[in-house]
Amino acid sequence: MNTQQRHSWGLAFGLCLITLAVNLQAPLYTTYAQLSGYGAAATAVAFSGYVLGVLPVLLAFGGLADRVGRKPLILAALGLSMLATVVTMLWPNLIALGVARLLMGVGTGLASATSTAYMMELMPTCDARSPANRVTASTSLGFGLGAALTSLFLLALPSVTPGSFWLQLMLAALALVVVWRLPDPAERIKHAPLLRLPVFPSGSLPYSFSMLLAWATSGLVIAILPSVLAAHDLQQWSGLSTFTVISCGLVFQPWVRRMHPARATGLGLLVLPLSYALLAWGASEGSLPAVLLGALGASSACYGFLYLGGLSAITAMAGAQKARVTAGFFLFAYVGFSIPVVVTGLLADHFGADVALIVFGLALLAGASITGLLIVRTAAFIAQPSHG
């Protein structure tokens, strides 16, 4: 392995450990809520602390890496991931979870603002997709792996501070050393603008809204599903469902890359409501195979068809404003990761989990149908020959 490859894998290791901490506590959400005396809505609010951390950093400090360099932001993100884990180890309750999610949101925002650019500088190549694919793979694996590890430790020994927390701290400390030794070749620009407001090119909104639907579904699986599974004594498996709904989407990405963006997004909007229906039915009936199969289908849509298809489409529309257009795309995604999840939690507290899951499913079906129709019409209009 040459030096460039070694450096790129070192950065990928650091990025994986940053995102591994994000959903590390997911299988314990219901336990934290019970210990704190709160319900599904409060759990969803604590879960959304992540978005409150990540969005301001992405928007208000998007140009920070140009001023201070790439490596300091990755090191800061690793430190915040460790601090967030320590907070929930010392105070295993819902308020501490909200604080930890906020810290992890800030850390992920710092890493997201520079990770792809840093990877491209460490592994120079004619094909810009290779660095981006390595960043996507390492972060997607981390997002799901943390929850899966906690589930495995809980199956072996129930605890509010499982061994996965200690494992994350040890691996993140190792990642700090690895990233510290990486070069940082980017030129510093002292007066680079920090603020990068989002831009939405004509025709991009349906693709952005499809990401809102996708991440709302994955957020529901992470934040609300554990309490539904707990009613059937399946809470310890919620980490596996989180891993499935996030990380298994990687399997579908090579296929999606060969598809036209509009076709990929349209297929994702078809798969998502069907997969959610199976997942919600399995959770209500206590059928773990149905939950995992539905989560796998949702993952193919959320982190395969809709993510790559939508990102490819809006990037093609962006022109010279790629960074700001991408910020707008993820703004929709993070709104979906918070507001619909909180609303569903409120419905679950007042009307029961089954009603909340049905209402979310109907809204998802309506949103996917309308968005899919808009994408099909936009694609058909663009494909028409000009008669100017």
What feature does the model see in each segment?
Residues 125-180:
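Helix-loop-helix hairpin linking two adjacent transmembrane segments in secondary transporters
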Residues 37, 69, 90-96, 282-286:
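Helix-breaking motifs and short loop linkers at transmembrane-helix boundaries and internal kinks
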Residues 311-363:
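A late C-terminal transmembrane helix in Major Facilitator Superfamily
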Residues 100-139:
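Cytoplasmic helix-loop-helix junction between adjacent transmembrane helices
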Residues 55-94:
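Conserved MFS/SLC helix-loop-helix module at the cytosolic interface between two early adjacent transmembrane helices
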Residues 163-179, 357-374:
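Symmetry-related core transmembrane helices of the 12-TM Major Facilitator Superfamily/SLC fold
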Residues 263-310:
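C-terminal transmembrane helical hairpin of 12-TM major facilitator-type secondary transporters
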Residues 45-62, 112, 116, 243-255:
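Central cavity-lining transmembrane alpha-helices of secondary-active solute carriers
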